[in-house]
C-alpha cells in the first residue's frame, strides 16, 4: 500500500506477494476501489503473479483532479506508476473500463507491454461507452 505522486496526481497502488512469474499490471473497471475486499490482489492470479493494481484517477484513494479525464491521461497514469516502480516491460490485464485503458496504454507505450489480456471490455476510447 503506497502512493506515488506525478505532476498532477497522487496514485494509490498495492502489490501482492512477489511470485516466480513476475509482476502483472491489473487495470480494473469503473468504480474500482482497492479498499473493497476481496479484490484482484486476492484472486487466483496472485498465486502466479505479483499483482500490481491501483485506483485510477478520480476513484478510491487516488486523487480526484477537477475537470474531465482523457484516455491518454488514464494510460499515462499507468506509465507513471511503472516508471516509479522501475518496471520497463510488464504483462497487462485490463477488465471492463480497465480494458479500454489497457488498449490506450499499449497504443501509447507499446514497448512496455509484454502480453495483453482484455476481459469484458470494448474499444471504447474518448467518448466511447465504458459499459
PLM features: what roles do these ranges have?
Residues 23, 50, 88-91, 112-115:
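Structural signature of beta-strand start/N-cap positions in the alpha/beta core
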Residues 94, 98, 102:
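Gly/Ala-rich beta-loop-alpha elbow adjacent to hydrolase catalytic centers
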Residues 30-31, 96, 122-123:
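Short, flexible active-site-adjacent loop segments at beta-strand->alpha-helix junctions, enriched
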Residues 5-63, 67:
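Conserved HGGG/HGGXW glycine-rich cap/lid loop of the alpha/beta-hydrolase fold
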Residues 52-93:
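Active-site loop/oxyanion-hole signature of alpha/beta-hydrolase fold enzymes
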Residues 1-2:
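Residue-level detector of beta-strand structural context in well-folded domains
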Residues 103, 107-108, 114-131:
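Flexible "cap/lid" loop of the alpha/beta hydrolase fold
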